[in-house]
Curated annotation (Swiss-Prot):
Species the sequence originates in: Schizosaccharomyces pombe (strain 972 / ATCC 24843) (Fission yeast)
Residues involved in NADP(+) binding: 18, 37, 63, 90, 159, 163, 192, 194
Catalytic residues (positions): 159 (proton donor), 163 (lowers pka of active site tyr)
GO cellular component, one term: cytosol
Organismal lineage: Eukaryota, Fungi, Dikarya, Ascomycota, Taphrinomycotina
Protein name: Uncharacterized oxidoreductase C24B10.20
Length: 254
């Protein structure tokens, strides 16, 4: 059973930015238990402080690039609950700001390992807990950078490609689990003022100054992003399985 008959969430990448905002909003809801992952829990100071005043928040160690780490994290969760209802993979990196011609193998591989294999590792490790849950929801935080029809003439190379691969993976999983009552979706979180966003804007500013200023002026807070995405996830239905959603709840093309 889920914890005390309530809803159990696993938020992967719950130690900062959007993930931390998800943890905070969810943990303020009655009957919700949240497992928040961090690659290095010892340095996740804000998450640790939050958990001290919210007994329904449990911190787990998880490095998504390692299947062994993902399985260990699932074992940590299983010591507390017998199933989970929502698995939300929010972790990711964006460090690729050069054209394809100049992007190194290391960058291609690191983005694929974290943004694609990472979510796969987590799904494989937590599947047995999800299939016993009530909701059976899997959510992947994706990006509009994955949309082929919406690609801008800027240099997201490895990042955009990895998010497109993530969306393909989401769609494949949605087909595989449909008969078992799962609802699997990807969501674009919006342009969010996180550490990753600030770094990206700094890298792109010299080449695309006008575009960067426009993007920065429209950026929203992690709290706004988390709240809007939760409105989507809180209302997921069977027919939403396999969909890619924008922050406002509209469907996005792949």
């Amino acid at each position: 059973m889920s914890a005390a008959g309530g809803i159990v969430y696993v938020i992967v990448g719950g130690n900062r930015g959007i993930g931390l905002s998800l943890v905070k909003e969810l943990s303020n809801k009655e009957g919700v238990t949240v497992f928040a992952s961090a690659r290095g829990p010892g340095s996740a100071s804000e998450l640790k402080d939050w958990s001290k005043t919210h007994s329904n928040v449990h911190i787990i160690k998880l490095d998504v690039t390692s299947l062994r780490s993902a399985k260990d994290a699932a074992m940590q969760v299983e010591k507390v609950v017998k199933c989970i209802d929502v698995l939300w993979v929010n972790s990711g990196i964006s460090k690729s700001f050069q054209p394809v011609l100049k992007t190194s193998d290391e960058l291609w591989m690191s983005h694929y390992q974290t943004n694609v294999l990472g979510p796969i590792h987590v799904y494989q490790a937590f599947y047995h807990l999800l299939k016993e849950g009530k909701l059976k929801n899997i959510v992947f935080t994706s990006s509009m950078a994955a949309c082929m029809g919406g690609v801008r003439p800027n240099t997201y190379s490895a990042y955009g490609q990895s998010k497109a691969a993530l969306n393909y993976t989401m769609k494949e999983i949605s087909f595989e689990l449909e008969k078992d009552g799962f609802v699997v979706v990807s969501i674009h979180p919006g342009v969010v003022n996180t550490d990753m966003f600030v770094n990206a804007m700094q890298k792109l500013a010299s080449k695309y100054p006008e575009m960067v200023e426009s993007i920065k002026s429209n950026a929203i807070s992690p709290e706004q992003s988390a709240s809007s995405m939760l409105k989507i996830v809180d209302n997921l239905k069977t027919e939403d399985n396999g969909m890619f959603y924008n922050l406002d709840g509209t469907k996005l093309p792949f």
